[in-house]
């Protein structure tokens, strides 16, 4: 048997200290904001049948062909650790009778899994927050989700003092007919330049031509710049839909910029596509993204159902939030005489029940315990000691932040008598 300590798996992380506080701050802020917008909390399985993702994401996408953690269970069924939330939520909408709640607003957060190259802010086990509106085909649903995302980022403090730090980039993919006409025009255009495109784009030309538009390869840039734009193919209905989204954002005071090359490669995406981007994280600049996916339910065997949603990586948001120190302890209860240990336990328990964060210092040298408590930096210290053979208490308020605690501390002193 090996005596070597197993090392962490590449692409995973042990989150602790200020990083854990920043992570928790993102989740807590998301939970508070989703309640303001009346999104219902859902919890989804960490693994699903592989077909849930292969049918929703597409067999030829990189996520399905290269990045999914798939395995056979003991019954021989192919299962996959979830690489994203939307497909599982869509499956539940169809299998669990959630249609009765349409339009349904749901939100969740948790770990996801993709086998990709780890880099700054990107892991093989990573975490996302996610919000979806299912069963609402009106532009107002898109507006609500975008306004919610904008408020979330502002309440996280991202870009609060630097308005240019995060930008909402917005595009329309049109309705089904508009998208197909645009796709055909792109195929014709790129085929004329196929030999000069990158290898990835040559491959995408037949499988997923819209994805050529967001290629980062310098060889593709001259051709993507002059490629046909969706605006030339939009139906009147699609133009009206996008106009209502942008006017809704303007009314809500959400700044946005048009990004005509912003696309979603899968055929079930329609109308609105969006990303909140930043230059604060290097080349990987998207911090929150989403769009309308009106054709997804049909891909999973359900009836046509309009839907729109977004997701954001918690790790990346936490990086933008910056380090968050742990909150200061309200009161440290110091037991300066071992005979008063049970009294110390009584006091620290009482404070916690009253909603006051408290720590007990009752070990080590009795003479050094008070100094130890001072170094811990709490707002106040309650010390218990024996004086002339009798229990006695005293408290020390470290700063104005502890003023509200005086009543509880004075009650403790009154019980034992002042030192």
UniProtKB/Swiss-Prot annotation:
Matches recorded under Pfam families: tRNA-synt_His (PF13393)
Single biological process term from Gene Ontology: histidyl-tRNA aminoacylation
GO molecular function annotations of the record: ATP binding; histidine-tRNA ligase activity
InterPro entries for the chain: aa-tRNA-synth_II (IPR006195), aa-tRNA-synth_II/BPL/LPL (IPR045864), Anticodon-bd_dom_sf (IPR036621), His-tRNA-ligase (IPR015807), HisRS-like_core (IPR041715), HisRS/HisZ (IPR004516)
EC number(s) from the headed UniProt entry: 6.1.1.21
Catalytic activity: tRNA(His) + L-histidine + ATP = L-histidyl-tRNA(His) + AMP + diphosphate + H(+)
Subcellular location: Cytoplasm
Top-level taxonomic group: Bacteria
Protein's UniProt name: Histidine--tRNA ligase
